[in-house]
């Protein structure tokens, strides 16, 4: 299994990093997880052909993980893709379709079938991929309740099983505790270092994880405690590098 990080930046755009997006290749499958801004351009840079993607996963509805998806779909349409494309969404697929319609982007016009599924259904289509709920969006509970909004606060981490073990893409999280049962026996973890408190990241060195890749920025507290990150285990995400798992 191969991991390529297309975007490792935080929600605030930076000149030297792209927004969240990763490619996972296993045997004949190619999966795109999250589609931050410029994702379509990044796929072109990596020479990903129109027919090559098997599925796209969106872990949660924040713009830095989602807003590139619309251009990816438009690109695949204009490239005359024919093969069915699975799109796994975190919540409320009907609302997503309304946004497509707002943009005058109609799946009915695509030359391929866009098969929209709930992200919980991943295992039904790929026996080596499953989604785990996390705590990233719980902080919105009060405003959702106050204004009676339809948001469901669903945010997900993704697990991919390979020959050497399990790869976990945490996506955005508030704590590592919320998915610790999933993390502790992983081979490689791509972990959000921009939201959790420093101790939540540092304590991962006491698990059996072989490699911990820090992405999505870094908190000031973790920056101050970088000397506690064992360089044999921890490293900062490098875009365009192919990681073997």
Locate predicted features.
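Structured loop/turn residues at beta-strand edges in well-structured enzyme cores
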Residues: 48-51, 124-127, 184, 207
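Core dinuclear metal-dependent hydrolase active-site scaffold
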Residues: 1-46, 118-178, 241-245
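Active-site neighborhood of phospho(di)ester-bond hydrolases with catalytic His/Asp-centered motifs
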Residues: 32-36, 53-64, 89-90, 168-171, ...
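Active-site metal-binding motif and surrounding structural segment of the metallo-beta-lactamase
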Residues: 38-88
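Binuclear metal-ion centers of metallo-dependent hydrolases, dominated by the metallo-beta-lactamase
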Residues: 176-188, 196-245
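P-loop/Walker A phosphate-binding loop and immediately adjacent motor/lid segment at beta-alpha junctions
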Residues: 72-86, 148-154, 201-223
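Acidic/polar short surface loop at catalytic or gating sites that assists cofactor/ion binding
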Residues: 84-86, 91-121, 132-142
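Hydrophobic packing residues within well-ordered alpha-helices of enzyme cores
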Residues: 43, 69-72, 96-101, 179, ...
């Amino acid at each position: 299994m191969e991991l390529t990080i297309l975007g490792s930046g935080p929600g605030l755009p930076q000149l030297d990093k792209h927004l969240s997006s990763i490619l996972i290749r296993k045997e004949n499958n190619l999966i795109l997880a999250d589609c931050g801004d410029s994702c379509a351009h990044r796929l072109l840079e990596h020479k990903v052909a129109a027919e090559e993607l098997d599925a796209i996963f969106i872990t949660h509805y924040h713009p830095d993980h989602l807003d590139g998806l619309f251009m990816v779909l438009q690109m695949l349409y204009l490239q005359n893709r024919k093969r069915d494309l699975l799109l796994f969404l975190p919540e409320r697929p009907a609302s997503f379709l309304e946004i497509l319609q707002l943009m005058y982007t109609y799946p009915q016009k695509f030359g391929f079938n866009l098969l929209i599924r709930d992200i919980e259904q991943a295992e039904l289509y790929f026996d080596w991929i499953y989604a785990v709920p996390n705590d990233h969006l719980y902080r919105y509970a009060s405003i959702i309740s106050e204004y009676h909004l339809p948001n469901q606060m669903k945010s997900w981490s993704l697990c991919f099983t390979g020959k050497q073990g399990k790869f976990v893409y945490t996506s955005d999280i508030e704590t590592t505790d919320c998915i610790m049962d999933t993390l502790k026996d992983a081979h490689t973890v791509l972990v959000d270092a921009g939201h959790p408190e420093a101790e939540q990241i540092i304590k991962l060195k006491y698990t059996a994880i072989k490699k911990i890749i820090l992405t999505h920025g870094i908190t000031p507290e973790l920056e101050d405690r970088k000397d506690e990150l064992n360089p044999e285990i921890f490293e900062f995400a490098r875009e365009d590098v192919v990681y073997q798992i």
